[in-house]
């Protein structure tokens, strides 16, 4: 129960806190008092009331719902407090101000708690405000965003990837933590403005400071407060980092201790990722292909400038507002943000083109594309290896080999195989060495390649009279 200030100490209280109570009976009566009728200095509520009713701090302190951080919407006249995120220095300034103006020295913890309470009473979401800044005028623009600004290929694939990604970006603002893992990779020479095009979507909530993906706790904290996250150069990523990167991109929440928090708890994802590269081959892992969608830029002449200057900024901002307003109509109508089978088929040639050269995969493809004798399944592994290497060494001319070793009629496409067969026939890795554990890494690589090989399904097969796990041509 709030204890009202006794009438006989009003005059003295006015002198102590240096506040004019005239016409402000309600908030004055809410001040917490100590046993002697003085204003309590250990009260969070008292700090909150003083800040809420101080004209100098009117509409200054707010809570950024998107960043989950305390902010200053403007500066405070006469104090070294400037617009931006709240800092430790600002805490010190407020405590000093309270002591100078009101003769009240509050504890640092109570002052910080009060700041959060005041901020939460005035919550804002800058990204929602940015998206909703203008009403869509009905002119389609969004699907052509990278086409118009970066001269990207004007085709169904580019428009589909752009649509999915923008829809995912907007959906994460309104539905934090929604499942979304599509990452466009803007390909093209330096100077096109690839990073700038991503930044322009909302410069204040863009970051390119993420140098690794999930390797340290700092990676997760960098996501806080940013909407568009540009990835580092994918071609520089080691294969050992691929798995953690895939998990990092696919996560729907991140657990860490946020600002103004003593606790570790899950923070729902509000950001999306985009990459840019000057390389033509940068994808190193077939299992990551479904996340990365290359977009070739600089193919056509851009119809809009991506570069911001005094003249172009109003035009760019208006266009961005219209793009985002359009995308919001998609999301409001239930737009799917998942890459469907059609998009995956459209993406496949682009993803394959972006893959780094893998000699091991090329050798396996040579083996799978080779035509073999009709009695192939009955041949020993050593004889199969001899046939394969003859095929490679003589550019597919195996007639002489067949005459010398067997007469098996017309050659036909290979129909099934196993990891062991590939390991011994293609890479000369004997079973003895395999059982000794020396070729475990090769076996894993072969399995990974075959699991993602077009035209082949993983099934149980029978080879040389024995059943084992293998792969069958579709």
Listing of model-derived features with the role each one plays in the protein:
Residues 1-140, 403-412, 431-434, 441, ...:
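N-terminal nucleic-acid engagement/recognition segments and initiation subdomains in replication
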Residues 118-224:
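P-loop NTPase catalytic core of nucleic-acid-dependent motor ATPases
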Residues 219-224, 258-276:
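AAA+/SF3 P-loop NTPase mechanochemical coupling elements
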Residues 225-227, 252, 269-272, 287-293:
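Short glycine-/polar-rich loops that comprise or flank the Walker A/P-loop
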Residues 228-249, 283-289:
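Conserved AAA+/SF3 P-loop NTPase catalytic/coupling segment centered on the Walker-B
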Residues 242-265:
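Conserved catalytic/switch belt of AAA+ P-loop NTPases
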Residues 284-303:
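A short helix-turn-beta junction within AAA+ P-loop NTPase domains corresponding to the substrate/partner-engaging
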Residues 337-474:
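DNA transaction DNA-binding modules
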